[in-house]
């Protein structure tokens, strides 16, 4: 007996599926390039925590293991004074910037920063079998260490994304008791300026997942360490968050400890054979290592050198939508923490209590860019595609969608500010809201830093040498060029006559 197939039949969509195209398909590049550079960018603060007085931060936290997310603001090229007015037609075209060159300059000497905790949860030194902790109520000790070494640079026209493990939600049908291991949840969020990088203890929310505040050093025990979500940014269909990235990481395990406290999930009896006498109790099996970034060398530096963007990893080939660019930098090879000392008295003899010790960390940056001027022809297909991708781009270009026809008659009062009529709806804000107003970035304004004289700047000269473009001609002096002398014609050689 015949019977129909039980497999599911998939019907294709009635309309063709929209395809994401690269920006090179509708963006025309010109031969006009500009150089832009920031001023010397400096940051000074305490490397472990911020100092507060009267609920006000007087000294910020500035650590060599923080993300530096620069929000670079560019001028509007459609309002730019161009050298040639015939480059584009404002009625049918719009101009955009394309980032083609970048150099992140780093000042300050190379150095290794040290972190630690005055009360670190260290029980046994499992690296050396003869060194063990004494059972007691509090076995925490003062331990210092250096962190994992990271160099990172990410460039895009949208903020980068980071991932970390946080505390998840328990199911309602699962009984929960005090001291149970919390469930984990992978959280993706925007990386902001000042967020901590992965130091070797994992990308996680230490404030929620380590309630004893003593399993990791003090600069991360109350915060969250994030790791760039490369998979999520690579899967971005439009490729705005990550044009390209540079990364270098290295770490090795330096010391090995275990944790004090009751083991929540003890070792099964099938895996061990208990001893006799004083070996009947099983020690803590919660092992942990202290990380180390090892040698810091100038031969393995990613910064202070130019990088040229020919082809991005996504569909956005360096176009700076919204006239902004996000540069995310991590450099732990310059994480030296300076120790400052101030005397309390003027005594001639040394006493520890006569001096106060302080710590500071300083950072120095310099950003240089090469931008290429590009044009977009405003056809119906291109405008529809840009509206689907990012409607705010068309709003910045003074384009909008016509509202549908309204069949109802609206009421408009003569006197709006009057107690005789009902309260009117508040008028909407005319200014465009900032989508990143609740996020923290280091804003770098380059609206007045553009220059077409590329040969006057270090990165511009490197670009001219690399690309083969010629700079502007040099200034001519008043010396008259000597006339070309005509060489006298060589005398013709007479042909010797021969007798026949």
Swiss-Prot record:
GO terms for cellular component: host cell nucleus; T=7 icosahedral viral capsid. GO terms for molecular function: structural molecule activity. It comes from the Viruses. Gene3D superfamilies: Major capsid L1 (late) superfamily, Papillomavirus. Residues 480-490 have a biased composition (Low complexity). Residues 475-500 are annotated as: Disordered. Residues 491-500 have a biased composition (Basic residues). Self-assembles into homopentamers. The capsid has an icosahedral symmetry and consists of 72 capsomers, with each capsomer being a pentamer of L1. Interacts with the minor capsid protein L2; this interaction is necessary for viral genome encapsidation. Interacts with protein E2; this interaction enhances E2-dependent replication and transcription activation. Belongs to the papillomaviridae L1 protein family. This is Major capsid protein L1. It comes from Human papillomavirus type 6a. The gene is L1.
């Amino acid at each position: 007996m015949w019977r129909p197939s039980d497999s599911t039949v998939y019907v294709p969509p009635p309309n063709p599926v929209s395809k994401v195209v690269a920006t090179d398909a509708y963006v025309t590049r010109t031969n006009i390039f500009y150089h832009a550079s920031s001023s010397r960018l400096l940051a000074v603060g305490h490397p472990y925590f911020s100092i507060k007085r009267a609920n006000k931060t007087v000294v910020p936290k500035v650590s060599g293991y923080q993300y530096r997310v620069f929000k670079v603001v560019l001028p509007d090229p459609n309002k730019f004074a161009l050298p040639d007015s015939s480059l584009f037609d404002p009625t049918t075209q719009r101009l955009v910037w394309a980032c083609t060159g970048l150099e992140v300059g780093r000042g300050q000497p190379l150095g290794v920063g040290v972190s630690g905790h005055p009360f670190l949860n260290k029980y046994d030194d499992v690296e050396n079998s003869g060194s063990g902790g004494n059972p007691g109520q509090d076995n925490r000790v003062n331990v210092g260490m250096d962190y994992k070494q990271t160099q990172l640079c990410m460039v895009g026209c949208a903020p980068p994304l980071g991932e970390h493990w946080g505390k998840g939600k328990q199911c309602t049908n699962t009984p929960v008791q005090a001291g149970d291991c919390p469930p984990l949840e992978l959280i993706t969020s925007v990386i902001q300026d000042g967020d901590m990088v992965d130091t070797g203890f994992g990308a996680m929310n230490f404030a929620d997942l380590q309630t004893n505040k003593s399993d990791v050093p003090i600069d991360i025990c109350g915060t969250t360490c994030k790791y760039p979500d490369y998979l999520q940014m690579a899967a971005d269909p439009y490729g705005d968050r990550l044009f390209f990235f540079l990364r270098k990481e290295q770490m090795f395990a330096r010391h090995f400890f275990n944790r004090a406290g009751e083991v929540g999930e003890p070792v099964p009896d099938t895996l061990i054979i208990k001893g006799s006498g004083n070996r009947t109790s099983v020690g803590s099996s919660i092992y942990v290592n202290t990380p180390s970034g090892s040698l810091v060398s100038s031969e393995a530096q990613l910064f202070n050198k130019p990088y040229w963007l020919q082809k991005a990893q996504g569909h956005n080939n360096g176009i700076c939508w919204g006239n902004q660019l996000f540069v995310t930098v991590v450099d732990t090879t310059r994480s030296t923490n300076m120790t400052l000392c101030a005397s309390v008295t003027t005594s001639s003899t040394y006493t520890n209590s006569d001096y106060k010790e302080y710590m500071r960390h300083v950072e120095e940056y310099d950003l240089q860019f090469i931008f290429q001027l590009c044009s977009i022809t405003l056809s119906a297909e291109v405008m529809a595609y840009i509206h689907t991708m990012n409607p705010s781009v068309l709003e910045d270009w003074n384009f909008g969608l016509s509202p549908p026809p309204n069949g109802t008659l609206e009421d408009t009062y003569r006197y709006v500010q009057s107690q005789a009529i009902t309260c009117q709806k508040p008028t909407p804000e005319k200014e465009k809201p900032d989508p990143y107003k609740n996020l923290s970035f280091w804003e770098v304004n380059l609206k007045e830093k553009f220059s077409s004289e590329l040969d006057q700047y270090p990165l511009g000269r490197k670009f001219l040498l690399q690309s083969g473009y010629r700079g502007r001609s040099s200034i001519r002096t008043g010396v008259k060029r000597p006339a070309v002398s005509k060489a006298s014609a060589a005398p013709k050689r007479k042909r010797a006559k021969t007798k026949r």
